Amino acid sequence: RTAHAAKMLGVDTVVGFTGSPIWAYLYSFPPVTEQMIEDGYQEFARRFLPILDEYQKLGIRYALEVHPTEIAFDTISAQRALEALGNHPAFGFNYDPSHLGYQGVDYVDFIYHFSDRIFHVHMKDVYWSDTPKQVGVFGGHVTFGDPRRYWNFRSLGRGCINFEEIIRALNAIGYQGPLSVEWEDSAMDREHGALESCEFVKQIDFQPSAHAFDACFEKK
């Protein structure tokens, strides 16, 4: 139904989640076998291939947000999800660097690795500490914004994400889609954050050069 609604609205990309039948196995203890993980990816494919086939018929793309609790949450799991689907042409990713950075994933390399599968981009920032904290990467069952946490989402430009390199990488792969602000900062007024984030995107975004920097020296 979502694909049909997108078609009627003239939307060519749907962003969403798939969930994961194997997220509970993340820590691999009690012991998890490779077959259990493979079965999880095959179950994901069994459920989503018919959906993606319908998307393809309608000319709509599905962009999975790479995110903890999903079947794809870092570069390797995203690659495995893509392979489980047989590299289905309707399947790609919603790129959100905030969910990669605090995990220690190379979020710029992710863009190059999936250069033809970045269907949508979330501009979202996150801060992570350079010193040990009481609450680690898994979140410790404390609320966002708690100062004991190792990481917290922040307004654009106030976290640790290097958006300069992200824009350069997106330009390098020829990305032409939207830069959609997803704003979260539990310590900041929403309206203030929305305004400054929009300005941040306007300032950080730039078009790639159509010429080499030394093109003026070329002989005519």
Which residues are covered by each model-predicted region?
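Active-site acidic/histidine proton-transfer and metal-coordination neighborhood
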Residues: R1-F93
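Histidine-acidic metal/acid-base catalytic patches
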Residues: G10-D12, Y25, L49, K57, ...
